[in-house]
Swiss-Prot record:
This is Zinc finger protein 264. May be involved in transcriptional regulation. Gene3D superfamilies: 6.10.140.140, Classic Zinc Finger. GO terms for molecular function: DNA-binding transcription factor activity, RNA polymerase II-specific; RNA polymerase II cis-regulatory region sequence-specific DNA binding; zinc ion binding. Pfam families: KRAB, zf-C2H2. Residues 14-85 form the KRAB domain. One of its GO terms (cellular component) is nucleus. Relatively highly expressed in kidney, thymus, testis, ovary, brain, lung, placenta, and prostate, and relatively low expression in heart, liver, skeletal muscle, pancreas, spleen, and small intestine. The modification Phosphotyrosine is found at residues 343, 511. Keywords: DNA-binding, Isopeptide bond, Metal-binding, Nucleus, Phosphoprotein, Repeat, Transcription, Transcription regulation, Ubl conjugation, Zinc, Zinc-finger. A zinc finger (C2H2-type) spans 203-225, 231-253, 259-281, 287-309, 315-337, 343-365, 371-393, 399-421, 427-449, 455-477, 483-505, 511-533, 539-561. CDD domains: KRAB_A-box (cd07765). InterPro entries: KRAB (IPR001909), KRAB_dom_sf (IPR036051), Znf_C2H2-type (IPR050758), Znf_C2H2_sf (IPR036236), Znf_C2H2_type (IPR013087). The gene is ZNF264.
């Protein structure tokens, strides 16, 4: 009884016109997308509350328009037409009916609906307030079958459930004239659930064919094609298609991070980022590849992985036609054509194509190396460098060459190695036309043309074109020899020197001549040997035109023209010094009588405590004449 009194009082005190807001076509056109969406949500919510209280809702056409995402204003010539798609072709009546199911006193929270009074006999039993809210969200309470909610009260032609917004799409009243004549929606002859009917009212994009079930969603999507970005950030001027994107972006300026991980305390400015981060702790990988079974934490990584199986490369460079699987790779490549270097270092003025390169460069000024290896304590500027380094400790080499079986610890190393088999040399010098297999070699070669030597020694000021050369040179100042042979204890300043030295102990000769099968320990020896077969003599004397197969042979030959010999002696058995008569080491070892040195002493001291075995160059003393 109390509920009935409350309902009667609500019907008297509140009407739909009291809470409704209407716009003309011109006023509606001045609203932006966010304001229109807010208006639709508020109007539908108010209507739902009035229906739950049993109040009549006469503006059926307005509500139906809002349900389908359409404009709330109507043309006069449309007032005589049917409001809902299911009513086409039906005769109009003037029987006043309302969509105002009253609250039943016996409704159970578990979904058991007891029979009660109903204003409209064809709409049947009403839902409780919780049930209406669930309908507004587009779903029903668990355990309740939509067909079982009001048994015996529904017309077989209309289930009366309403649309996803919780308002019956067959509201039953439509204003057709100033005299407030209405027609009745007594039944829906379509025989379909209005939820299904709403899905069939699809709005299709004329540009790409994408389909939406709401008109305002289509309007938002069309901005992608038109390029309209009406929402502008007041801080940096960046524009966005959606207001939600602007709100998310604004947190970058405010520094706000409201979503905090309960496990590690890390905070994020978006809830989706927190959800993705929490999968690290839970180990959840919901995205699984059907081809190889590999699972991923993030959907974006899963999509990129799938392109490896399909071979899809979605991003095509309009300048050179090169295609890329990933958008970041495409953007990095495109800067090569534009020549743009928008990121400048405030310390030294150096400019970079990419922001990440600038960030890495800035760490050279600060000396910061935030990534530390847990095994050996070595620190790195970049996380990628740490990952590359860590494979040294694990010894893992998962990338194997199918041609020769050689394995590598990084995919990039395998790709570079495979060019040896294919003979591919994609990097061509525009100056001389020389081609290279590796990009790093190509960059070093270009410095030969430009004369650039960006790596300078802080000790002596000597500059180098290659960073590795600087590292090798610096060991001269430090005297450090970190690479020690475990067999004999000999130490080396370079890793390559130790590797070559180890071949002496192992007897390994990996460099084999394809002509005669002779093997060598070092690649340089193989190169020298190969000249024997080719007959090539690239080193030519500029004086007489004689050619040699080795540079050392040319150097020796040129001394005949200059008259200079590299070794100077005061006397045999004493250290060599400059400024005295010079002889070649070859002649000295052969024991040729050539010496013509100004000295008062014999070439070999007469008094010596050394044995003959300690004097490898001792021989009969020649007569020395004065100059």
């Amino acid at each position: 009884m109390a509920a009935a009194v409350l309902t009667d009082r609500a019907q008297v005190s509140v009407t739909f016109d009291d809470v409704a807001v209407t716009f003309t076509k011109e006023e509606w056109g001045q609203l932006d997308l966010a304001q229109r969406t807010l208006y639709q949500e508020v109007m539908l919510e108010n209507c739902g509350l009035l229906v739950s209280l049993g109040c009549p809702v006469p503006k059926a056409e307005l509500i139906c328009h809002l349900e389908h995402g359409q404009e709330p204003w109507t043309r006069k010539e449309d007032l005589s037409q049917d409001t809902c798609p299911g009513d086409k072709g039906k005769p109009k009546t003037t029987e006043p009916t309302t969509c105002e199911p009253a609250l039943s006193e016996g409704i159970s929270l578990q979904g058991q609906v007891t029979q009660g009074n109903s204003v409209d006999s064809q709409l049947g039993q009403a839902e409780d307030q919780d049930g209406l809210s669930e309908m507004q969200e587009g779903h029903f309470r668990p355990g309740i079958d939509p067909q079982e909610k009001s048994p015996g009260k529904m017309s077989p032609e209309c289930d009366g459930l309403g649309t996803a917004d919780g308002v019956c799409s067959r509201i039953g009243q439509e204003q057709v004239s100033p005299g407030d004549r209405v027609r009745s929606h007594n039944s829906c002859e379509s025989g379909k659930d209005p939820m299904i009917q709403e899905e069939e009212n699809n709005f299709k994009c004329s540009e790409c064919g994408k389909v939406f079930n709401k008109k305002h969603l289509l309007a938002g999507h069309e901005k992608i094609h038109s390029g309209v970005k009406p929402y502008e950030c007041t801080e940096c001027g960046k524009t966005f298609i959606k207001s939600t994107h602007l709100l998310q972006h604004h947190m970058i300026h405010t520094g706000e991070r409201p979503y905090e991980c309960m496990e590690c305390g890390k905070a994020f400015n978006r809830k989706s980022y927190l959800t993705q981060h929490q999968r690290i702790h839970s180990g959840e990988k919901p995205y699984k590849c059907n081809e190889c079974g590999k699972a991923f934490t993030h959907r974006s990584n899963f999509v990129l992985h799938n392109r490896r199986h399909t071979g899809e490369k979605s991003f095509v460079c309009t300048e050179c036609g090169q295609v890329f699987r990933h958008r970041p790779g495409f953007l990095r490549h495109y800067v090569v054509h534009s020549g743009e270097n928008p990121y400048e270092c405030l310390e030294c003025g150096k400019v970079f194509k990419h922001r990440s390169y600038l960030m890495w460069h800035q760490q050279t000024h600060t000396g910061e190396k935030p990534y530390e290896c847990s095994e050996c304590g070595k620190v790195f500027l970049e996380s990628a460098a740490l990952i590359h380094h860590y494979v040294i400790h694990t010894g893992e080499k998962p990338f194997e060459c199918l041609e020769c079986g050689k394995a590598f610890n990084h995919r990039s190393y395998l790709k570079r190695h495979q060019r040896i088999h294919t003979g591919e040399k994609p990097f061509v010098c525009s100056e001389c036309g020389k081609a290279f297999t590796h990009c790093s070699t190509f960059i070093l070669h270009k410095r030969a043309h430009t004369g650039e030597k960006p790596f300078e020694c802080k000790e002596c000021g000597k500059a180098f074109s290659n960073r590795k050369d600087l590292i090798r040179h610096f060991s001269i100042h430090t005297g450090e020899k970190p690479y020690e042979c475990v067999e004999c204890g000999k130490a080396f300043t370079r890793m390559s020197g130790l590797t070559r030295h180890k071949r002496i102990h192992s007897g390994e000769k990996p460099y084999e001549c394809v002509e005669c099968g002779k093997s060598f320990c070092w690649s340089t020896n193989l190169i020298r040997h190969a000249i024997i077969h080719t007959g090539e003599k690239p080193y030519k004397c500029s004086e007489c035109g004689k050619a040699f197969s080795r540079s050392s042979s040319l150097t020796q030959h040129q001394r005949m023209h200059t008259g200079k010999n590299p070794i100077s002696v005061t006397d045999v058995g004493r250290p060599f010094t400059s400024g005295q008569t010079s002889v070649t080491l070859r002649e000295l070892l052969l024991g040729k009588d050539f010496l013509n040195v100004t000295t008062e002493a014999n070439i070999l001291p007469e008094e010596t405590s050394s044995s003959a075995s300690d004097q490898p160059y001792q021989r009969e003393t020649p007569q020395v004449s004065s100059l």
